[in-house]
C-alpha cells in the first residue's frame, strides 16, 4: 500500500488505513494465476506491409481494452461508437484528420482523446522515415462492473 507521499491538509504525512487497504487486496491472485490472468500476453491481430496491429489483452474484470499500432505512413480508424484514448509511444509526430475534415497535430509521448462522435479518423505519420507506434485504449463493448 502506498499513499504517493502526499501530505494531509495539515502539512503532515497522511495516515494509512491499513484495514481498508487489506480489504482491497486479492490474496488468491498469486503464482500461476498471475501469469495466466494478470500479465498481458500481446499477440498480433494483423500484420502486412502497411501496419502491425497487436492486441494487448487486459484482465476480464477491466472495463477497457488496449491495441498497439505500428505503421510508417497512415492508418484509418473507426470509433465504433466509443471514444479512443491514444498515445504516441514511438516516432515523432502525427496529424489526426477526422472524416469531417478537422485536423490536429500530436507529438511523441502526447496523449489525446478521439470522441466517439468522430466516427472515423486517419492518423498520418508526419515523418515516414521513422515508424509510429501508437497505443489505443477504449471501453470494451460488453462491460460488467462488480
What is the meaning of each model-derived region?
Residues 93, 111-113, 133:
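Residue-level marker of beta-strand positions
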Residues 102-104, 129-130:
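Short, surface-exposed beta-strand-loop junctions and turns on beta-sheet-rich folds
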Residues 106-120:
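Conserved metal-binding segment of the jelly-roll/cupin
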Residues 16-20, 141-146:
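Glycine- and charge-enriched low-complexity intrinsically disordered segments
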Amino acid at each position: 500500500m502506498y499513499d504517493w507521499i502526499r501530505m494531509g491538509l495539515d502539512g503532515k504525512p497522511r495516515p494509512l488505513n491499513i484495514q481498508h487497504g487489506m480489504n482491497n487486496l486479492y490474496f488468491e491472485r498469486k503464482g500461476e494465476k498471475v501469469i495466466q490472468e494478470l500479465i498481458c500476453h500481446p499477440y498480433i491481430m494483423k500484420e502486412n506491409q502497411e501496419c502491425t496491429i497487436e492486441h494487448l489483452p487486459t484482465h476480464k474484470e477491466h472495463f477497457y481494452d488496449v491495441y498497439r499500432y505500428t505503421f510508417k505512413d497512415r492508418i484509418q480508424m473507426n470509433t465504433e461508437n466509443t471514444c479512443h484514448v491514444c498515445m504516441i509511444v514511438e516516432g515523432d509526430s502525427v496529424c489526426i484528420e477526422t472524416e469531417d475534415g478537422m485536423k490536429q497535430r500530436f507529438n511523441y509521448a502526447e496523449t489525446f482523446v478521439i470522441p466517439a462522435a468522430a466516427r472515423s479518423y486517419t492518423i498520418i505519420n508526419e515523418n515516414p522515415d521513422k515508424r509510429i507506434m501508437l497505443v489505443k485504449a477504449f471501453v470494451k463493448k460488453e462491460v460488467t462492473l462488480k
